[in-house]
Curated annotation (Swiss-Prot):
It comes from the Eukaryota. It holds the Pfam family Oxidored_q3. Its EC number is 7.1.1.-. GO terms for cellular component: chloroplast thylakoid membrane. This is NAD(P)H-quinone oxidoreductase subunit 6, chloroplastic. It comes from Staurastrum punctulatum. Keywords: Chloroplast, Membrane, NAD, NADP, Plastid, Plastoquinone, Quinone, Thylakoid, Translocase, Transmembrane, Transmembrane helix, Transport. InterPro entries: NADH_UbQ/plastoQ_OxRdtase_su6, Nuo/plastoQ_OxRdtase_6_NuoJ. NDH is composed of at least 16 different subunits, 5 of which are encoded in the nucleus. The keyword Transmembrane applies. It is a multi-pass membrane protein. Belongs to the complex I subunit 6 family. Its main location: plastid. The chain crosses the membrane at residues 13-33, 35-55, 64-84, 98-118, 152-172.
Amino acid sequence: MNMVSLPETINSPILYFLDVGILLGGLGVVFFGKIIYSALFLGVVFVCVALLYLLLNADFLAAAQILIYVGAINVLIVFAIMLINKPETKINKKKITFGDILSGFSVFGLFSFLIIMILNTTWLQPTLVSQEVKNSFQSIDIIGIHLLTDLLLPFELLSILLLVALVGAITIARKEISPKI
C-alpha cells in the first residue's frame, strides 16, 4: 500500500483547518437551540476526525470513523430526533441550587486538572511520523493487540462512557407520563 506523505508546509495548515472544524463543530453541537442542527454539527465533527485520521495515514481508522460514527450513529441520532417529534420546551429560569454549584465546582476542578496534566506532559516535537512507525500500525491485528493490551484501561473507560451516554439518551427521550387526577 502506498502512503501519501505531505510536506510539513501543507500538513500543518490542513491540520489547523481540521482542528478549527472540530472546535467549531463542537461549539455548534452545544450552542444551537434546535437539536437537529446539533446532530448535523456532530456529523461535521465526526467527518473532521476522520480526515485527521487520513492525514495521519490511518486509512482503516478513517474508514471506521466514517462508517461507524457518520454512517451509523449520526444517522441514528437524526432518525431518533425525527421520530420522537418532541415539541420544543421553553427554559424556565430558576434559582441556582446546591447541585448547580456542586456541578460547577466539579467541572472547574476537572478542567483545572486537565490543564495541569497537559502543561506537565512532555510532548514530542511536531514532526511527521517516520515510515517505520507508520508501517507498524497498518495491520488491523496490531491495532486490536494494542487496544486489548496497552490501551485496555482507556478502551474500557470509553465503553463505560458510551454506556452512560446511552442510558442518558434513553432517559431524555423517554416520554414523561403525567398522572391523571
